[in-house]
Amino acid sequence: MVLAFLVKFPMYFVHLWLPKAHVEAPVSGSIILAAVLIKLLGYGIIRLRRVTNIRIISSQIIALALIGGGILGVLCIVQRDIKVVIAYSSVVHIALVIAGRLRLTKWGFEGVLIIILAHGVCSSGIFAAANMIYERRHSRRFFFNSGLLNRRAIFRIV
């Protein structure tokens, strides 16, 4: 049952649907996906702990999640599309959620709640900012949007 949640949860080696969904979806779809749907899967993982005993395979899943998060962290550096970078970084954050929850400690649980809430607010705002950039510059590529800190003062604050 845990593995079924990990397939829907965007864990790198199991299922990599999230970046494709974010890139293809309109901005409102990306915001809803980042703010609500991924959090529902996190809630499922939190509730699932009470049903199953996952101590047997938790260390293997933690290792898999952190290795996948590291790979995607490196992939974020070489991407050229703003929405792809935001989506890959979401998968990295979800890898931390998986590792923290499967750690099976109180600190891991509290850290997961903080990451889930912060990710819901921040990633939605980042997608909205990326849409603002796209509407003004008509491109999601970093190359065409370089120098925005010099041109727009609001991006210095963000």
What is the role of each PLM region?
Residues 1-158:
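Core, highly hydrophobic multi-pass alpha-helical transmembrane subunits of bioenergetic inner membranes
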